[in-house]
Swiss-Prot record:
<protein>
    <recommendedName>
        <fullName>Urease accessory protein UreF</fullName>
    </recommendedName>
</protein>
<dbReference type="GO" id="GO:0005737">
    <property type="term" value="C:cytoplasm"/>
</dbReference>
<keyword id="KW-0143">Chaperone</keyword>
<dbReference type="Pfam" id="PF01730">
    <property type="entry name" value="UreF"/>
</dbReference>
<comment type="subunit">
    <text>UreD, UreF and UreG form a complex that acts as a GTP-hydrolysis-dependent molecular chaperone, activating the urease apoprotein by helping to assemble the nickel containing metallocenter of UreC. The UreE protein probably delivers the nickel.</text>
</comment>
<keyword id="KW-0963">Cytoplasm</keyword>
<comment type="similarity">
    <text>Belongs to the UreF family.</text>
</comment>
<comment type="function">
    <text>Required for maturation of urease via the functional incorporation of the urease nickel metallocenter.</text>
</comment>
<dbReference type="InterPro" id="IPR002639">
    <property type="entry name" value="UreF"/>
</dbReference>
<keyword id="KW-0996">Nickel insertion</keyword>
<dbReference type="GO" id="GO:0016151">
    <property type="term" value="F:nickel cation binding"/>
</dbReference>
<dbReference type="InterPro" id="IPR038277">
    <property type="entry name" value="UreF_sf"/>
</dbReference>
Amino acid sequence: MIDHQALRLFQFCDSQFPTGAFSHSFGLETYIQRGTVHDEESFKEWLRLFLSEQLTYADGLAIRLVYEALNQNDPEKILHLDRMLFVQNMPRETRTGTKQMGTRMVKLANELYDSEWIQWYEAQYNEKNAKLHPAICFTMLGHFLGIDIEMIIDYYLYQNVSALTQNAVRAIPLGQTAGQRVVTDMITFMKTTRDHIFELAESEFGITAPGLEINQMEHENVNVRIFIS
């Protein structure tokens, strides 16, 4: 039997969902211009790195911690995580792009659902107490819909894999079938990533690979671009 609450959250995983994810490569375009990422296999290698580093220690761990804070009714913890996600995101384009995506997701979520936490989160933004991050909004929505934390993380990872793969299809370019092979091949790795997130200590929050951040910073200087970040 279909879990319609899960489908409601899965709607936000659509690569065409209007948060602006289709405009961001999060440094992938820099790797493509250098020739480091140039085909299906090299893209999968980059995608594994992105999931196992930035998405694990930033967004993924934040989702777990925000979910715990929601259960404990701890708004200060959520605001702290919001600030940490923003200030630890060193590349300017990526930091700004993530904030824009978070703002759009929060506004859309508030249009579609009556979640007190998401309404509170947007109010904190209006009062300049929060930056708005898509991982936090996604967690709040999943929590509101009664989705378990494992599925919330799985869906968030899938959302990122799907969006980045569609961007790679355009930018490398890859065929649509090759793109779907990448997503299929990444499903097992997504489970491994999720399991790792549950093993992390909170003190590990924000760890990332310098190479990813450097290439995200250098994206500002690429000669020709089709992505904002």
